[in-house]
Amino acid sequence: MIKAGIIGTGNIGTDLLLKLIKTDFIEPIIFAGRRMSSNGIKLAQEKGINVTDKGIQFFIDNKIYIDVIYDCTNATDAKKHAKIFKEQGVKVIDLTPAKIGDLCVPTINPEAIKTQDNVNMITCGGQASTPLLN
């Protein structure tokens, strides 16, 4: 089982959380945001997921064991986060426009997720339309 964290509790992070809950190979163990009053954190609590409003500070203060972090924040914060997670040995799947790691399109180069410390997912439009090219 892959142990995952999500940082960013807005629409993208929350949608991702709901998808991860349904998988049988990824266990979302922490959902990190900035406000306990956010709709995403409230929903995660209802689903029994551990939450925090400490954002990146939670990961700095708590060396919890996760295999991968999904960064659903913004490009500016993702650049700061990438350094912290690299020091901790945590793989990053970046869903922001930061373009820190190699671009990853699972239908084209799925091996990037296994071989790189940080991968940047292309836009949702790109992810959705790429299979049409095959």
Predicted regions and their residues:
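Short active-site oxyanion
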Residues: 2-3, 27-30, 66-69
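Glycine-rich adenosine-cofactor-binding loop
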Residues: 3-16
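NAD(P)-binding Rossmann-fold cofactor-contacting core
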Residues: 23-47
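Short acidic-hydrophobic, aromatic-tinged amphipathic segments that line or gate anion-handling sites
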Residues: 50-58
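Beta-loop-alpha module in the N-terminal Rossmann-like domain of NAD(P)-dependent dehydrogenases
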Residues: 59-60, 64-85
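Oxidoreductase and adenylate-handling cofactor-binding alpha/beta cores
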Residues: 128-134
